């Protein structure tokens, strides 16, 4: 079996729930189904505008999950306070714009480097691992290393939207550089069965984060079957 871990993002279960302001589908139940069908960890993005995941969702997931919780947040004081209270296994810092439909790209680490120094130190002081969601760019990885980030997650959106050898080469080179810098390398955004199979073959990538596609597949085939199939797809890359 592949050593690639599968993180399942369940944000859009909350989107469906919030469309009618009801308490179903139950995000805890979906998370448990995901885990029972191969999810190695659960990812949620608590956005500043609370458009899908709510604060209570995060606390409930943390208290009930038998696998690690990966909490995506913007690097703000409000989110830092919530993360410290929740104490997830890992916090993934992502850029955020209120008008965007989804995260549009990686962090510009250099532009907020000084701010991130104390932000990351604070998370580490509570034994929370830190991931930086970045473009597959060598300079961003070097900055992540200086910040003592535990992991980076390479933004695969550009490759998924334009599956050229050039875009894939950027990811391959970035993952190799992470290895040389002793930073754990994850990848995610826009992945489907086909693109996930390709990215899972990239040396030194240890985890994939996949959400929207799996939730869409769940409409047709069920959440359990969709996650199980994805797990088999990335496992078959050995």
UniProtKB/Swiss-Prot annotation:
GO biological process: pyridoxine biosynthetic process
Active site (catalytic residues): 45 (proton acceptor), 72 (proton acceptor), 189 (proton donor)
Keyword Transferase assigned: yes
Residues bound to 3-amino-2-oxopropyl phosphate: 9, 20, 190, 211-212
Disulfide bonds: none
CDD domains: PNPsynthase
Reactions listed under catalytic activity: 3-amino-2-oxopropyl phosphate + 1-deoxy-D-xylulose 5-phosphate = pyridoxine 5'-phosphate + phosphate + 2 H2O + H(+)
Key words, A-Z: Cytoplasm, Pyridoxine biosynthesis, Transferase
Marked site positions, Transition state stabilizer: 153
GO molecular function, one term: pyridoxine 5'-phosphate synthase activity
One term under GO cellular component: cytosol
Enzyme superclass (EC): transferase
Binding positions (1-deoxy-D-xylulose 5-phosphate): 11-12, 47, 52, 102
Short name of one Pfam family: PdxJ
Pathway membership, UniProt: Cofactor biosynthesis; pyridoxine 5'-phosphate biosynthesis; pyridoxine 5'-phosphate from D-erythrose 4-phosphate: step 5/5
Entry EC no(s): 2.6.99.2
SUPFAM superfamilies for this protein: Pyridoxine 5'-phosphate synthase (SSF63892)
Protein localization: Cytoplasm
Family statement: Belongs to the PNP synthase family.
Job description of the protein: Catalyzes the complicated ring closure reaction between the two acyclic compounds 1-deoxy-D-xylulose-5-phosphate (DXP) and 3-amino-2-oxopropyl phosphate (1-amino-acetone-3-phosphate or AAP) to form pyridoxine 5'-phosphate (PNP) and inorganic phosphate.
Oligomeric and partner information: Homooctamer; tetramer of dimers.
UniProt name for this protein: Pyridoxine 5'-phosphate synthase
Species whose genome carries this gene: Ehrlichia canis (strain Jake)
